Curated annotation (Swiss-Prot):
It comes from the Bacteria. This is dTTP/UTP pyrophosphatase. The record marks R11, T69, Q153 as: Important for substrate specificity. Pfam families: Maf. It comes from Thermoanaerobacter pseudethanolicus (strain ATCC 33223 / 39E) (Clostridium thermohydrosulfuricum). Its main location: cytoplasm.
Length: 191
């Protein structure tokens, strides 16, 4: 069965490619807005909107995967930084503390529009950093298109002290949860 990733994230593409999956990418282009207040419901709502918008456009039978990731610290949601100053503020706020990364995933089968939404959460501790180190990291440019302004899979690994939970969730797609849902709910076997 055809698999479609409803995401423009290069990290999600890379994660699925690393699994050896044959898939197509179709960006959803939906507005990333949800009235949900709880982080887990918020990311599931956004992932649902992305997956369903792509699923409705498809003519052939497919499994569509949508995802959305946010960073939350003390009930404050951090999205992608708009500029260098906002990236600095985010990283300054995260450093020396723990935050939570939430990723919502939704899988939609176009044949009958059956869908399953779920989420993963991972605790991340960022090291205490000097301002110069924060600016040097920002100047690598890798954090601009990422929630929380850092990439754990890149140079950002240098600023992460530890994590508790799913590493791939922090990258942007909880692979194990995706595998389980595809197998259990849609009889799609990746192994």
């Amino acid at each position: 069965m055809k698999i479609v990733l409803a995401s423009k994230s290069p990290r999600r593409r890379e994660l699925l490619s690393n699994l050896g999956l044959d898939f197509e990418v179709i960006e959803s282009n939906v507005e990333e807005f949800s009235s949900e207040k709880h982080p887990s419901r918020y990311v599931m709502d956004l992932s649902f909107n992305k997956a369903m918008s792509v699923a409705k456009k498809l003519k052939e039978e497919a499994i569509v995967i949508g995802a959305d990731t946010i960073v939350v610290i003390e009930d404050k949601v951090l999205g992608k930084p708009k500029d260098r100053d906002e990236a600095f503020i985010m990283l300054k706020n995260l450093q020396g503390r723990v935050h939570t990364v939430y990723t919502g995933i939704t899988i939609v089968r176009t044949k009958d529009f059956k869908y399953v939404s779920d989420f993963e959460e991972t605790k991340v501790w960022i090291k205490k950093l000097e301002d110069e180190e924060i600016f040097n990291y920002i100047d690598t440019g890798e954090g601009y298109d990422k929630a929380g302004a850092y990439a754990i899979q890149g140079v950002g690994a240098l600023i992460v002290e530890k994590i508790e939970g799913d590493y791939f969730n922090v990258v942007g797609l909880p692979i194990s949860k995706l595998f389980d849902i595809l197998k259990r709910e849609f009889d799609v076997r990746l192994l």
